[in-house]
């Protein structure tokens, strides 16, 4: 059995459970799967690829989390997988981990639903991930790589890329973000070693033509797409790379997936990703950025818009995130009309006064503490006015509570 920092990993479940699952409507061998290694900030790749294939008429689904599965379906899948898990334990093996159980349940649900294509996002993301149990994906995609999950994946981009490259399958095409030279070198070498065709996508392959609060128009310049212009409903420029990776995947799979350019345009324009630079009201953007790379991408976007209108910030974070560095990064490059801070996260919450002190020390000129999230959001909207933009940043807990407030107020 292989382990990762002492934890049992997916390879131990491959033989017995996967063989058993082959009898369940061919759950593993007959689903057409696009395996994706990505970070939370890049999940729009998965959404974009899925949306394009849905527009062609395929039944598609995504493996990210079980939020969209009804309770009965979820329970039936659990009971089916638990039988096999109990057999493993009885034979002296280990019980599948929480994430391995979810993966196996996902495969059962997808097979029973009769989907045509699955975009399968890795969990931790690579060599030791439960999703590597799938042996025959139609493509493997690796989005941008940064220093994340370092305690498990390594302390350099190259080491993390080595783990991410573990999703590559011999002979199966791999499409990857080639902007970081260290990561790109590792991915290329692994693809060559396995005889897998490798397709690199870089920022220089794209050109942003328009970037407004309504979205982005961009060109993806290559022989297949020529100088076509695509529109995406995102305001963050990093989403252009994710969209380009999805477009490249469709191109590489053109002999597998029959799709017209019109369908591609409609699919990419209809892509949505909740909680990541998501416009929830006119001029109001929520972003669950909570790590170094996510905050950097938020700042890049806010820098663009601060040239056009005054910005207001609603901020909160939980205690296991490096919120001090987050605040310093934000304040070093963005000037806000007003900053409202609040507390989220239950037992992990940080007193809002702590955030206020840090923002003031970092140079923010107007900072206000509002402990109640709903009241904090209302106050931030009031300050935003008709002429500005409001960014709600720092935690997915904050994003969730704000979206809940908006839903309640619509009733």
Segments (PLM) and residue ranges:
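Positively charged, low-complexity intrinsically disordered leader regions
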Residues: 1-27, 151
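Short internal beta-strands
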Residues: 33-35, 63, 173-178, 313-315, ...
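Glycine-rich phosphate/diphosphate-binding loop of Rossmann-like nucleotide-binding domains
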Residues: 36-55
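ATP-dependent carboxylate-amine ligase catalytic core
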Residues: 67-135
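Short beta-strand elements in bilobed, periplasmic/extracellular small-molecule ligand-binding domains
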Residues: 53-66, 366-368
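Acidic, Mg2+-coordinating active-site environments of NTP-dependent enzymes
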Residues: 88-89, 114-121, 137, 142-229, ...
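Nucleotide phosphate-binding/pyrophosphate-handling subdomain across enzymes
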Residues: 117-120, 128-141, 145-148, 159, ...
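C-terminal helical cap/extension that packs against the catalytic core
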Residues: 180-190, 195, 283-284, 327-389
